[in-house]
């Protein structure tokens, strides 16, 4: 069960007329959560994440795919022991996902906490995505690396 309170933070970067963003803001404000707005440059969203360290991150597949691709590339570039450790940690957590477990005491502390800190999602409780399809392997990657549920929303705004 997800509880939202005054300690929660949301990075708002989606257009305010967007129904998804509007519903998110109303819900969070109703619960007393805080909302930080991005700098206005979508290329600097990762900087904004690092500054605000949100607990709730509604996003769109385009950005989540970008995060996935960048992290995968960094792991491949690191190579050697780091890549092997990541692969082992990832495989262990992938097994846990089958039973609905997002966390692993050893691998989260040893591997994934560093990634979460670097991205600015070390306090994340939930990610929510919508507006377009997103691949299952990307959703699983995000659940494994960021140790949280990633929910998909569907709707029609026309």
Feature names for model-found ranges:
Residues 112-124:
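Membrane-proximal helix-turn-helix segments that form the acceptor-binding/catalytic region
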Residues 109, 118, 136-137, 141-144:
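Flexible, glycine/threonine-enriched loop-and-boundary segments that flank and lead into catalytic domains
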Residues 8-9, 124-126:
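Residue-level recognition of the N-termini of beta-strands and the immediately preceding loop/turn
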Residues 62, 125, 130-138, 148-158:
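Conserved A3 ("GATE") glycine/threonine-rich loop of ANL adenylate-forming enzymes
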Residues 1-12, 16-109, 145:
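Conserved AMP-binding/adenylation subdomain of ANL enzymes
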Residues 43, 113, 140:
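Active-site phosphate/pyrophosphate- and oxyanion-stabilizing loops and adjacent acidic/basic residues
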């Amino acid at each position: 069960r997800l509880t939202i309170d005054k300690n929660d933070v949301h990075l708002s970067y989606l257009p305010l007329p967007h129904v998804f963003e509007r519903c998110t803001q109303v819900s969070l404000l109703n619960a007393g959560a805080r909302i930080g707005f991005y700098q206005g440059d979508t290329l600097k969203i990762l900087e904004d994440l690092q500054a605000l360290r949100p607990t709730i991150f509604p996003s769109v597949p385009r950005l989540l795919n970008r995060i996935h691709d960048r992290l995968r590339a960094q792991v491949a570039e690191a190579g050697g022991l780091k890549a092997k450790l990541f692969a082992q940690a990832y495989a262990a957590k992938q097994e846990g996902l089958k039973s609905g477990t997002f966390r692993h005491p050893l691998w989260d502390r040893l591997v994934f906490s560093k990634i979460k800190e670097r991205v600015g999602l070390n306090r994340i409780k939930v990610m929510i995505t919508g507006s377009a399809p997103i691949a299952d392997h990307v959703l699983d990657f995000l659940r494994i690396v960021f140790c949280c549920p990633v929910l998909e929303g569907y709707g029609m705004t026309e």
